[in-house]
Regions:
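Conserved catalytic-core motifs of GNAT/GCN5-like acyltransferases
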Residues: 122, 140-149
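Conserved GNAT acetyl-CoA-binding A-motif
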Residues: 115-125
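A short beta-loop-alpha structural element at the N-terminal edge
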Residues: 1-15
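Conserved small/polar residues in nucleotide/adenosyl-binding loops
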Residues: 150-156
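Conserved active-site alpha-helix within GNAT-family acetyltransferase domains
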Residues: 126-143
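Conserved acetyl-CoA-binding loop-helix of GNAT-fold acetyltransferases
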Residues: 100-114, 131-132, 136
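Conserved acyl-donor/pantetheine-binding loop and adjacent beta-alpha core of acyl/acetyltransferases
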Residues: 66-100
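Conserved GNAT-fold acetyl-CoA-binding loop/helix
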Residues: 21-41
Length: 159
């Protein structure tokens, strides 16, 4: 079940992100999150702002992700492409799991799609696993965005 994260989830969420960072490094993506992303303060802010969600099964958290409806400053400039639509959209960020739930990203997409019909998601050029999952779930590459800490490839949801 996907639900909003609450402050009591913080320790479990940070453990999930630690596992995800380790997995990313082991699978050829050591630079996207390094050793410290996402920082604790960002997670606290996401929880406070009701922008962080978790996947919970039988009382155990298995995944976390940020979902924000509204304009995302990182998507204002797109290179080598264009957006499919200028309609209001939701953005999926900071997807992480403990590796025990098959189809977690598909569940995220279904959950977010039910909230707003236009979605955007991005990932690092080295994150081949996430790129595969994004494309598998009906997104297409739309261009390249730049953020302060890295250069990301950017797909967006097909309409």
């Amino acid at each position: 079940m996907i639900r909003l994260a609450v402050p009591e989830d913080f320790t479990s969420i940070m453990s999930i992100y630690a596992y995800a960072r380790s997995f990313m490094q082991e699978t050829g993506n050591p630079n996207q999150w390094g050793n410290h992303f996402p920082p604790e303060e960002l997670i606290h802010n996401r929880i406070r702002n009701k922008q962080l969600f978790v996947l919970e099964e039988n009382g155990t958290l298995h995944g976390a992700f940020a979902f924000i409806i509204g304009e995302d400053p990182t998507y204002l400039q797109i290179d080598d492409g264009s957006w499919l639509s200028d309609a209001p959209y939701g953005t999926i960020h900071q997807v992480a799991s403990d590796g025990t739930i098959h189809g977690f990203f598909s569940q995220i997409v279904d959950y977010c799609w039910a909230q707003i019909p236009h979605l955007r998601v991005d990932t690092h050029a080295d994150n081949q696993i996430m790129q595969h999952l994004i494309l598998k779930n009906g997104f297409e590459r739309r261009g390249i965005i730049s953020v302060s800490y890295t250069h990301l490839t950017l797909p967006t949801k097909l309409e």
